Amino acid sequence: MIEMKEVYKAYPNGVKALNGISVTIHPGEFVYVVGPSGAGKSTFIKMIYREEKPTKGQILINHKDLATIKEKEIPFVRRKIGVVFQDFKLLPKLTVFENVAFALEVIGEQPSVIKKRVLEVLDLVQLKHKARQFPDQLSGGEQQRVSIARSIVNNPDVVIADEPTGNLDPDTSWEVMKTLEEINNRGTTVVMATHNKEIVNTMKKRVIAIEDGIIVRDESRGEYGSYD
């Protein structure tokens, strides 16, 4: 479970990104975070995986407060949070298999477990047949699906996706969304920040709309809304 309680975030330059946000996201939910540019969506997302720390308030992930945990505890919390970025962040000199395996290698997992788990998640994202290829040999959609595989290889409770279709064409975007929906159907919570109106309106998931750092709308089967 993800809980935010009266969360504020003010940056040193005076920008107030979040202004007293309180929200609960339950296990297994699929949630879109929408709003105009500069509304606070990215800050909201970054709070969940502790890339940003709140100025004030509580952020609880499975009852652990990310606002007060020690720095040395952060890597352990992140093991249960998968992150998918807009720009993939794949390592160009590693194969598809190696990119996904890296997430397990850094925590000291056994080689036999790594091989089994990596092949399982590559099969899930339908890229097992490209395990030995390098990122520059893949399409944009394929690279993003590798990124998704990497985000779930450690069996996270939550997957955070920050504009995962932002650099993709419409058809490829839908391929990525089908993959995220399949992950959600298997029980993983998915929280996704997006500007893609068509995807939000078609898939009919929970929508949290943020404007000027506050939640202005929270609907169980919501739509995107109108933003410039």
Curated annotation (Swiss-Prot):
ATP binds at G35, P36, S37, G38, A39, G40, K41, S42. One of its GO terms (cellular component) is plasma membrane. GO terms for molecular function: ATP binding; ATP hydrolysis activity; transmembrane transporter activity. Keywords: ATP-binding, Cell cycle, Cell division, Cell membrane, Membrane, Nucleotide-binding, Transport. Disruption phenotype: Cells lacking this gene and ftsX, the next gene in the operon, delay sporulation onset, as a result of which they form a medial rather than polar septum at the onset of sporulation. This is presumably due to slower phosphorylation and activation of the spo0A transcriptional regulator. However, at later time points these cells undergo polar division and eventually form smaller than wild-type mature spores. GO terms for biological process: asymmetric cell division; cell septum assembly; positive regulation of sporulation resulting in formation of a cellular spore; regulation of phosphorelay signal transduction system; transmembrane transport. SMART domains: AAA. This is Cell division ATP-binding protein FtsE.
